[in-house]
A protein has these predicted regions:
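Ligand-binding pocket scaffold of soluble enzyme catalytic domains
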Residues: 123
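N-terminal accessory segment detector
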Residues: 1-120, 128-149, 153-170
Length: 170
């Protein structure tokens, strides 16, 4: 990415990729929040994070539509160490197919016990962000490979089946 092609990410970094050790901190934080506040409290935290912290990106998505969503996810995963991801922009939706999740991959390589609800965080964050941008979001899979779908309301995505989000495990 050249300096003439700014990233769709809301932050700037001098290194080409983030630090994979962040995944250890995220996993530990989720474990703490779930233990302290329960699943409902953790979900509220993620929803507020999706609406609040990600507000600048959500606004980009609202203004730029599905093209902005696709660009964001391409830039996001380009900065994540170890992920294998395909982003496809279709007329009514964007499909983010995670063939190898960088977080789960790193947690496993580090021998960490992965919070079993870990993969649900992508759903709760994603729904909050999509709704703020006038879109819908669904998630299927997990535990290292999944599919995120961001769609226009006209895409009429089926109701989310929470059973389709696989629990994370070592």
């Amino acid at each position: 990415m050249s300096s003439n092609d700014p990233s769709a990410l809301p932050y700037r970094d001098t290194k080409p990729q983030g630090s994979a050790d962040f995944y250890f901190a995220t996993n530990a934080t989720f474990r703490f929040l779930i233990g302290r506040f329960g699943l409902a409290g953790w979900r509220r935290y993620l929803e507020e994070l999706g609406r609040g912290y990600f507000a600048p990106v959500n606004q980009q998505w609202r203004r730029g539509g599905l093209g902005a969503v696709a660009r964001y996810w391409r830039d996001f995963f380009a900065a994540e160490p170890g992920g294998v991801v395909t982003v496809e922009e279709l007329p009514d939706r964007v499909e983010v197919v995670v063939h190898a999740c960088p977080a789960i991959k790193h947690l496993r390589a580090g021998g960490r016990e992965v919070v079993k609800e870990y993969c649900q965080h992508c759903f709760f964050l994603g729904v909050a962000r999509a709704e703020a941008a006038g879109l819908t979001m669904r998630l299927a899979g997990g535990n290292g490979s999944c599919r995120h779908t961001y769609g226009r309301p006209s895409a009429e995505l089926p109701v989310q089946d929470m059973q389709s989000i696989v629990e994370a495990r070592l």
